[in-house]
Design a protein with these regions (language model features):
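Hydrophobic core positions of alpha-helical segments in small-molecule transporters
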Residues: 30, 66-70, 89-92, 187-190
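Transmembrane helix-bundle signature of multi-pass membrane transporters/permeases
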Residues: 90, 94, 188-196, 250-254, ...
Length: 287
């Protein structure tokens, strides 16, 4: 329905859709401002996560250096190819992400502290929080479907990341590029499979962090849990270094995929919607 309506109205962006659908230029300007203002901290959070990750793996290099490199790479193919570039890179990065998640799940389950699929449940049952654990939890809570002190937060997080994304401007913008009804059916099946594998893999990896790290929060806080987990599992040996490099590419791909969509959407809200609307209003001849 979104694609049909935008094609009928000739809308290119979400603010443009609001103006043509409801005949309100003020709504267009307001939507463009909201999108730009709130997507900036969104992208900042992605940069911070990447900076923490690369800073943990390469402690000799400052985090801001990695942020600058990632920003330049993202800007390079966005400027060169626009939306077509993001579509192709999303496909490639999606394949890298799903391969990386599968490899990481296998590596985590194979760790001595986890002990495979069967050992994971048994070890979690026997888990005891160490003194100073910021979120003390018993083994019974960790293996109970409705247990654990973070159960409510987990449910909220799953709902937010599963259904909240439907209304994100950068996600809705992808609907505008749908070719036909057949593409919708194929895309629904493929994206569902990808989301199930990646989502379940991410939550499974997170659930093993207490076992691998012994319930001790790393020096960098919660943002350093996954980087520390990766270093502890994959830090030694040639195979470990190769797998760690693959995981780094996976995380970089996932983050850059998000960044490119956010940057393209926020930039278009200013360049396509906000600036032309304001200029037209300023240059409008007086009666």
């Amino acid at each position: 329905r979104t694609r049909k309506m935008t094609k009928k109205l000739g809308a290119r962006t979400m603010p443009d859709y609001f103006e043509k659908r409801y005949g309100s230029k003020g709504m267009k300007i307001l939507a463009a401002v909201i999108i730009f203002v709130f997507l900036v901290p969104y992208s900042a959070a992605v940069y911070k996560g990447l900076g923490s990750l690369f800073g943990a793996v390469f402690p000799g290099v400052e985090s801001w250096v990695w942020m600058l490199i990632i920003a330049c790479l993202t800007a390079l193919y966005l400027v060169a190819g626009g939306y077509i570039a993001t579509a192709y890179t999303d496909l490639i990065q999606g394949i890298i992400t799903i391969v990386g998640v599968v490899c990481l799940v296998c590596a985590v389950l194979g760790h001595d502290a986890v002990g495979g699929v069967t050992g994971l449940i048994e070890n979690l049952k026997n888990f005891q929080s160490v003194p100073g654990d910021p979120n003390p939890t018993t083994g019974a809570q960790l293996t109970n479907m409705f247990g654990g002190s973070s159960f409510r937060f987990l449910c909220f997080n799953i709902m937010l990341t599963s259904f909240g994304t439907w209304g994100l401007p950068q996600m809705i913008g992808k609907f505008y590029a749908i070719k036909d009804t057949a593409a919708i059916k194929r895309g629904t099946i493929i994206s569902t499979i990808f989301c199930i594998v990646i989502g379940c893999g991410a939550y499974l990896i997170g659930s093993t962090s207490r076992l691998v790290l012994g319930g001790v929060l790393p020096k960098g806080g919660v943002d350093s849990v996954i980087p520390t987990l990766l270093m502890k599992i994959l830090g030694g040996g040639t195979a470990g270094i190769i797998l760690l490099a693959l995981i780094m590419i996976l995380l970089l791909s996932a983050s850059m995929s998000t960044l490119e969509a956010v940057v393209l959407t926020s930039a278009s809200s200013v360049a396509v919607d906000l600036i032309p609307a304001v200029r037209k209003k300023e240059t409008k001849p007086e009666a």
